[in-house]
Amino acid sequence: KQAPARVQELEEWGAVFDRTSEGLISQRNFGGHRYPRLAHVGDRTGLEIIRTLQDFCVHQGIATHMECTGLDLVLDGNKVSGLVGYWRETGRFILFKTKAIILATGGGGKAWKVTSNSWEYTGDGLGMAYRAGAELIDMEFTQFHPTGMVSPPSVRGILVTEGVRGDGGILLNSEGERFMFNYIPEKFANETADTEAEAQRWLDGDREARRPPELLTRDVVARAIKTEVEAGRGSPNGGAFLDIASRRPADFIKKKLPSMYHQFKELAVIDITKEPMEVGPTLHYFMGGIRVDSDSQQTNIPGLFACGECAGGMHGANRLGGNSLSDLLVFGKLAGGGAKQYVNNLTNTINCNDVDVSRILTNATDILNRDEGKNPYLVHEELQDIMQNNVGIVRTAEELQIGLGKLDSLKADIENVYAHASPQYNPGWNEALDLKNLIITAEAVTRAAILREESRGAHTRIDFEGEREEGLSYNIIIKKTDSSMTAEKISREDPPQELVDIAHASLKELEGE
């Protein structure tokens, strides 16, 4: 409900969205959507949002601490009172004394070997919140985007936007077959085209036609590509072919997909206006995260708030394409409002606990003071192998339990990582510090995946195929108890009647309203 207002706000602050010939904001199709909803700026909407917000911060005089990384939260009793961080450039520590903190740190995709996430996505917010006593929720739901680059190896996993398929791109196997017609789930059959002719009519704007199968939800498309590869029908580098060159003129592609055109030109020496791309599934997004109140975005720790990808519960079991941007805009504003209200209602003085601060500093510098230890890069690679092989797109109890055992064994190595003694410009130290959050993130996902014995949304258990009715009645919560992690099911509250009516309404009933 609040997303349109946030888009208008961005425009007032200087964002320039694509327009229709009538002057309205252009909205495009993405996977899982029945209608073109996504306001966009070519295929670089996220960059435009970042640019706009950065400019706004500068003009408002908001302090920004570049290359400053959070280490841990400081508590006064059970309330947030500060955060200890460090400057990557100098290695110097900094203590932020504050009455409230909003975490907006993204997910933990770097726990997997193949991911669209950049180097920052190491579960920092998840780890800090968990250690402070906050609960995590829905961690089993990790989204694998169906289209990441697969070649060359140095760029494997980098995102290929869903906009390629939204603008007409099709998926082909090594035999030239448009295979997504073979993978339409029964629950989506009534709204998905089952012939190429109908799919083309939909692309041409026929409201009576159903959407192409390439625009099914991301979990469906990712599993389909994986199945084709395992059946021996994959592309040479273990993916599928994404072809828009044969579907759209070169000028259209360069105008609507400029980032993708340059990305493949520079990184893979491929001209997407002339030849297909090779793509494959890549870990992309966490539906799970820190458990928050839906209105204020506050956690169970007073003064700690979270929004965006690091907050859980917004997207259920499966996020629709494009909703992450509207999510962070809408719930970012709610988090700001919640934090302001919390601070205004505080009556007691908040103090930083010196013992907490000293402990955080000691844990960080111990890595530099060792004479020897484990190589943090090799430990990270081992963690990524575990998650890629045991907690992937499809899961079984046996593989998950093996993965959990390996993660448990890896904890000793993480506690004994070593980096060169100088804290200045020390990426090895940065990597070692990140591992403390990555192992928490990886273990939380694995434990939750073991406990959910069904296949729902982005969580697929091939030993428990299909959804179970019971699965709708609970969420899985991750808690810190003493020095160990526990996962437990908690009953969900009854949703508002309005949402119940929507969930059980037919497509025709919804369109008639």
Region roles according to the model:
Residues 1-17, 134-137, 142:
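Conserved FAD-binding subdomain of flavin-dependent enzymes
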Residues 6-92, 97, 104, 148-152:
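Conserved redox-cofactor binding core of oxidoreductases
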Residues 135-266, 338-344, 380, 385:
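An anion/pyrophosphate-binding glycine-rich loop and adjacent beta-alpha core
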Residues 63-110, 140-145, 245, 259-297, ...:
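Conserved mixed alpha/beta core segments that line enzyme active sites in large multi-domain catalysts
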Residues 5, 9-12, 48, 52-59, ...:
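Alpha-helical scaffold segments in soluble metabolic enzymes
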Residues 13, 20-21, 41-43, 67-69, ...:
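Fold-independent oxyanion-binding glycine-rich loops
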